[in-house]
Amino acid sequence: MEILRFLLSLFIYFLLLNLSLSHFPSISAQRTNHENFLKCLSHRINEDDSRIIHTSKDPSYFSILNSSIQNPRFFVLETPKPVSIITPVQATDVQSTIKCARLHGIHIRTRSGGHDYEGLSYMAKSRPFVVIDLRNLRSITLDVDNRTGWVQSGATIGELYYEIGKLSKSLAFPAGLYPTVGIGGQFGGGGYGTLMRKYGLSADNVIDAHIVDANGSFLDRQGMGEDFFWAIRGGGGSSFSVVLSWKIRLLDVPSVVTVFKVVKTSEKEAVSIINKWQYIADKVPNDLFIRAMLQKETEVYASFPGLYLGPVSDLLALMKDKFPELGLEIGNCREMSWIESVLWFIKGESMEILAKRKRTSRSFKGKDDFIEEPIPKTAIQYLWRRFEAPEARLAKIILTPFGGKMSEIADNEIPFPHREGNLYEIQYLAYWSEEEDKNKTNTEKYLRWVESVYEFMTPYVSKSPRRAYVNFRDIDLGMYLGLNMKTKYEEAKVWGVKYFKNNFDRLVRVKTNVDPMDFFCDEQSIPIMKYVNDI
């Protein structure tokens, strides 16, 4: 019996080995494919191709690659590097890249701002690849009279805020807090920030898009169709196409808003106030956004930063009625314009900082959960005490309130499904210095801290499935391995339903229709089915 088991195992091993070897070309064939791809692309590009094509032999290669690695955890020698980087300057360059890549069997990744939590926009773990870096496609055109704008995917949300702020003090757009995040990734996964309770996600306010599909065709909303347009707004746009630009809806904000921050250093008081926050943060008027945060400097503390779309007098009256436990006073508050509030949240001094690009210096690992019922005070107390660990010296736990507009939008309106019924989303983040990445043991202790907090929270978070936000990508949820004879759909459903709930199957249908050869793929991309009717 043991001999039979051994022979069976040996047979399976060689079968899998044969399959893997037949699936990927030899090293020499890969090199030839890449050379032919570059010849094809050079022939198609009308301009000076040195501005667009960068191989490892070029002086520009490493400066371009490294400039947008926004998690230094992957800024190490072991991280797989692209065989070349393409920096298109116009839509036809992207079309040519896709056509040549398909013709010569080249795998691609698309990078906007480089903020993918797991680095999947600029690395691939299983095969040679080319990065399409959209840094040169960053134009922003705003129409204040019609309250719309076009913004290219290579722009950052900071650049978008900057352009809005230059033109108007009474218009805004709902996106994230960190100005260096790329538009392509932010909108493609959903995108939220301080205006989410008032206006929803970034993707909720996208009304058209320009893309290049897997055939190299240039399409707008009408050309791609409503299912395709639905999928790229929150379903991870890079699974379906290269999104070149987005048409957005600009939204009204009052000329005066109020920002505030309250800090609590007493464990007992902080735990009590966070507990109360759970019961009111999603139910207060839509004009009010209050986050709760745990972190550590010299000591552990809780902070409650927020934005109110109105004057301080109205805010103080509202807080006295709805959340007196916080003890908000006029000294905690500042009136300003909305664009100034964007700067306040990042501790910036001038608008120009929004338009500057820089690479972060801290490595990190993040996980997140959605909370449907208030967690017990004992759990909050546990989270506070986890910051006593040495590896939590730079860590953060961020609680972001939902409710408001987020609860008014149907969970299938776009692929982002986390709507009504969610009190808040909670993120667990560990940070460490880039220098510490040189020692794997150092890195592992930070990863374990995040994992331990995540495991502790299991009884208190969403279930069946335990859900997650695709823009906070977590490779621990699963990735394509090609083992156990499972189809890609079977593998992907493990994490796909966590990110997209019941919208996952519709995303698979769209993917199968628009990219049947699975050209746009990564370790957690939307899969295809062999037959659409299999779903």
Swiss-Prot record:
Any GO molecular function: oxidoreductase activity
Subcellular location: Secreted, Cell wall
Record's keyword terms, sorted: Cell wall, Disulfide bond, FAD, Flavoprotein, Glycoprotein, Nucleotide-binding, Oxidoreductase, Secreted, Signal
Location of Pros-8alpha-FAD histidine modifications: 115
Cofactor (UniProt): FAD
Listed SUPFAM superfamilies: FAD-binding/transporter-associated domain-like
Positions bearing carbohydrate: 18, 66, 146, 215, 439
Signal sequence coordinates: 1-22
Domain spans labelled FAD-binding PCMH-type: 78-253
Tissue: Accumulates in cell walls of etiolated hypocotyls.
Disulfide bonds: 40-100
Enzyme's top EC category: oxidoreductase
Gene Ontology CC annotation, any one: extracellular region
Membrane-spanning intervals of the chain: none
EC number in record: 1.1.1.-
Pfam family name, one: BBE
Family as reported in the entry's similarity comment: Belongs to the oxygen-dependent FAD-linked oxidoreductase family.
PANTHER family: OS08G0158400 PROTEIN
Listed name of the protein: Berberine bridge enzyme-like 27
Protein source organism: Arabidopsis thaliana
